[in-house]
């Protein structure tokens, strides 16, 4: 069988996209002709700052935003200290009388300054409070640290400001109206003039994405392979997901950039983590480091908790007063953002997708309001509203009613109660259609567990989707609990997985020429990490351990190819995209639809287009989703799936390339199958504004094309899964740190095969019945990168596997040996050089 405990790999030209003969090129430029941006050493940080400056709309906006962040921190600390030590609450609450008049019988008005203590008294109370002094000292040190960091960042971003002006020739006034694709295209062109990277003559879009998203790609892969402890089963609550900003910060601190982390710098993994000889020692070292960071979090817990409470209060108090139903609104959870993120997807691209899916996601969750809760909310709103109406009427009649004690408080609380109750009352005109809503959501978020399809009306699906799309109040509560829960997760949940994390970084890290060490999943190579049930059958050599779950490799490749049409993918990826295009053409032709229109006219689609104020691409998605349910008599689920697949394929076939200067009218431009020129960066006419407008419109059509491809690929995957019910999904178990091999079959320690869950991110304990495996979609496709010599890798059909201690797999019915050749665990660093893969 194949050897899955691979060593660190160095990949060259196939991923660097360098011209032939320039793989190891080192460009030399005469000293006098060097530009200020020649040979930038830390390109990761440089490209990240270029991207951040673009997202923050220029240097001035970024500078003012940073200044306000410093002032905001200073205000929170100073204002809290003032409220604690400098206010006489007895006067404020009228428990103590203040008389400014010489005649005691005269009425007295208490002003706000009367409740403020004198400066001397305030200072004395602060000095007497030792706990407050300690907190102020720590806050002052932290603020000075942020101030120094702010000054340093301003100096660095001024250099980026000059880079935009002189190298990219983009003025700051025009930067907010330039898309990232336009900036990226100019960076690629600037490389030819200034040689930003001396290891390559030309930069590609993938090189830039790799440097900006190096650590983010690792995080997406860790979540995809379920290696981070994010799911917990609690008594009375069932399975919950806990992933907060504080926990994510600690993960990144431990793994990527903190002292003693796995990385030597931003672009290079430490040499000892690239070899398998010291894996147990490295795992123990990582475990100890996690323990100490967990203890540090525990000691700092009171301070962090106080800051979280104060920041949440000052941030959301005004919002809650102005819009009491805001906490009843929903937002995408941090886990959802990581689970739904493609490999090599920038933050603004992810945010754009999630924003498009917000409305249908909200409508879907509103379909599941409890009838009992709705009944209670209606009656609660009636009683609270009645009392509120009487108080408001009395106030209108005589405003002195507000002077009565607690009247204003009662009015405020009753108003909040009415608003909260209304948020639990559904719209009386709403139609319950969860399946169509879930399909629209899938068109935008692109990822969804298999067992959700066809079960959108079930409460289990709703509860699992709520882990991705949670209440804003739940998000705030998790952030408040994070300082308490994070140390427990680090010490008791993350430490036992130290060995698996060490193996993950060794097995899934490759060195790309001109880029450095990157996550191998970020290469989007269907041969290395494709899944046979996601159109990669016959094209992938990946084991179950190496496969990305939920079609992450295939969908990420499609997304990147559509977003960056000028990018030239490797040979296997090109073959995959070509095969998908052929499949779309076949299914679209089989649909028997007219070439002039996307779908036949139907009443539901006409009403959707007449009632919606959406853009044309979103109306197209609504057309595709609604089309298959509006034509003909009711069909079985399989026939409905085939019809839906044909509808999507027909919509994709209708896409035609948009020529420069042609306005998009009724046609969607093809960005994946075009000539390789990014039409979104082309300007039509002499006006810059026209070019920018066309760029935005074409970007919208590109996102629509990706949405249709996501629907189409999920439908193909569903049909293939039904033909082959047993899906082979890698799911982790606790590491065997002893390093012993798995028991032989028939031995005392032999175990029955564990049930395979349907989704690594949403595990299900119910196993599927076995079935014969289907043939490959693209049989006979066994091409590999020329020049790769890996005799240990043998392509074979998927079969049942049992887990090995190192994360490898053995076929059922065979002895479960851990390695074809045992890897020594100590003292073998010199005998185990990294395996170099030449391309």
Swiss-Prot record:
Domain notes: Forms a homotrimer with a solvated central pore, which is connected laterally to the cytosol through the cavity within each protomer. Acts as a lipid scramblase that uses its central pore to function: the central pore opens laterally to accommodate lipid headgroups, thereby enabling lipid flipping and redistribution of lipids added to the outer leaflet of ATG9A-containing vesicles, thereby enabling growth into autophagosomes. The tyrosine-based sorting signal motif, also named YXX-psi motif, promotes interaction with the AP-4 complex.
Motif Tyrosine-based sorting signal positions after renumbering to this chain: 8-11
Catalytic activity field: a 1,2-diacyl-sn-glycero-3-phosphocholine(in) = a 1,2-diacyl-sn-glycero-3-phosphocholine(out); a 1,2-diacyl-sn-glycero-3-phospho-L-serine(in) = a 1,2-diacyl-sn-glycero-3-phospho-L-serine(out); a 1,2-diacyl-sn-glycero-3-phosphoethanolamine(in) = a 1,2-diacyl-sn-glycero-3-phosphoethanolamine(out)
Protein name: Autophagy-related protein 9A
Stretches for region Disordered: 656-689, 717-839
Lumenal side, ranges: 85-128, 398-406
Name of one Pfam family that matches: ATG9
């Amino acid at each position: 069988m194949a050897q899955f405990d691979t060593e660190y790999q160095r990949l060259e030209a196939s991923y660097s996209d360098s011209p032939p003969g320039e793989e190891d090129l080192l460009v030399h430029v005469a000293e006098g002709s060097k530009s200020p941006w020649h040979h930038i050493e830390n390109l990761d940080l440089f490209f990240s700052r270029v991207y951040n400056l673009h997202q923050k709309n220029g240097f001035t906006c970024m500078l003012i935003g940073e200044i306000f962040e410093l002032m905001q921190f200073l205000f929170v600390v100073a204002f809290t200290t003032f409220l604690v030590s400098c206010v006489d609450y007895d006067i404020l609450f009228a428990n103590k009388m203040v008389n400014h008049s010489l005649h005691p019988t005269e009425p007295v008005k208490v002003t706000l300054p009367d409740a403020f203590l004198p400066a001397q008294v305030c200072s004395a109370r602060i000095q007497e409070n030792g706990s407050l002094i300690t907190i102020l000292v720590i806050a002052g040190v932290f603020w000075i640290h942020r101030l120094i960091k702010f000054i340093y960042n301003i100096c660095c971003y001024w250099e980026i400001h000059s880079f935009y002006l002189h190298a990219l020739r983009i003025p700051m006034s025009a930067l907010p109206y330039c898309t990232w694709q336009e900036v990226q295209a100019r960076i690629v062109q600037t490389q030819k003039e200034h040689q930003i990277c001396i290891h390559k003559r030309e930069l590609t879009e993938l090189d830039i994405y790799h440097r900006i998203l190096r650590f983010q790609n690792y995080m997406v892969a860790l979540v995809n392979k379920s290696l981070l402890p994010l799911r917990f089963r609690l008594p009375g609550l069932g399975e919950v997901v806990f992933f907060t900003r504080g926990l994510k910060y600690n993960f990144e601190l431990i793994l990527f950039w903190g002292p003693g982390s796995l990385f030597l710098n931003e672009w290079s993994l430490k040499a000892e983590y690239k070899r398998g000889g010291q894996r147990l020692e490295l795992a123990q070292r990582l475990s100890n480091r996690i323990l100490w960071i967990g203890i540090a979090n525990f000691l700092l817990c009171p301070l962090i908790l106080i800051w979280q409470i104060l920041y949440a209060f000052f941030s959301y108090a005004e919002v809650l007063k102005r819009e009491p139903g805001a906490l009843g609104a929903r937002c995408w959870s941090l886990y959802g953002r990581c689970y739904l993120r493609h490999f090599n997807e920038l933050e603004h691209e992810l945010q754009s997708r999630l924003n498009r899916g917000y409305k249908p996601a909200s409508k879907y969750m509103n379909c599941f309001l409890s009838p009992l809760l709705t009944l209670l909310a209606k009656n609660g709103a009636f009683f609270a509203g009645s009392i509120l109406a009487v108080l408001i009427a009395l106030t209108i009649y005589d405003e002195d009613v507000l002077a009565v004690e607690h009247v204003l408080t009662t009015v405020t609380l009753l108003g909040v109660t009415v608003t909260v109750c209304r948020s639990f009352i559904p719209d009386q005109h709403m139609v319950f259609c969860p399946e169509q809503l879930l399909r629209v959501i899938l068109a935008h978020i692109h990822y969804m567990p298999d067992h959700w399809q066809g079960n959108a009306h079930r409460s289990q699906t709703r509860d699992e989707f709520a882990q991705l799309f949670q209440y804003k109040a739940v998000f705030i509560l998790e952030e408040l609990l994070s300082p308490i829960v994070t140390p427990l997760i680090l010490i008791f949940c993350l430490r036992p997985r130290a060995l698996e994390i060490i193996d993950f970084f060794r097995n899934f890290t490759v060195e790309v020429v001109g880029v450095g060490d990157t996550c191998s999943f970020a290469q989007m190579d269907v041969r290395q990490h494709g899944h046979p049930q996601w159109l990669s059958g016959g094209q992938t050599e990946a084991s179950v351990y190496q496969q990305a779950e939920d079609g992450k490799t295939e969908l990420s490749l499609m997304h990147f190819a559509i977003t960056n049409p000028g990018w030239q993918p490797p040979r296997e990826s090109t073959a995959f995209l070509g095969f998908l295009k052929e499949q779309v053409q076949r299914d679209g032709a089989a649909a028997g639809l007219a070439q002039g229109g996307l779908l036949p006219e139907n009443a539901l689609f006409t009403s959707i287009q007449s009632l919606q104020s959406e853009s044309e691409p979103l109306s197209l998605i609504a057309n595709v989703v609604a089309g298959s349910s509006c034509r003909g008599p009711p069909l079985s689920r399989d026939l409905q799936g085939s019809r839906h697949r044909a509808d999507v394929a027909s919509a994709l076939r209708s896409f035609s390339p948009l020529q420069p200067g042609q306005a998009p009218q009724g046609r969607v431009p093809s960005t994946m199958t075009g000539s390789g020129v990014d039409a979104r960066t082309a300007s039509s006419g002499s006006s810059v504004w026209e070019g920018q407008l066309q760029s935005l419109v074409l970007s919208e059509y590109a996102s629509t094309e990706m949405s249709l491809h996501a629907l189409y690929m999920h439908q193909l995957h569903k049909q293939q899964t039904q033909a082959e019910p047993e899906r082979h999904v890698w799911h982790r178990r606790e590491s065997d740190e002893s390093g012993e091999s798995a028991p032989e079959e028939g031995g005392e320690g032999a175990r029955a095969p564990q049930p395979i869950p349907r989704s690594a991110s949403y595990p299900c304990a119910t196993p599927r019945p076995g079935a014969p495996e289907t043939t490959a979609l693209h049989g006979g496709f066994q091409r590999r990168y020329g020049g790769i010599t890996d005799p240990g890798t043998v392509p074979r059909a998927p079969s049942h596997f049992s887990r090995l201690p190192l994360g490898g797999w053995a076929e059922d019915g065979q002895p479960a040996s851990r390695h074809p050749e045992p890897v020594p665990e100590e003292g073998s660093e010199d005998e185990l050089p990294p395996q170099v893969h030449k391309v």
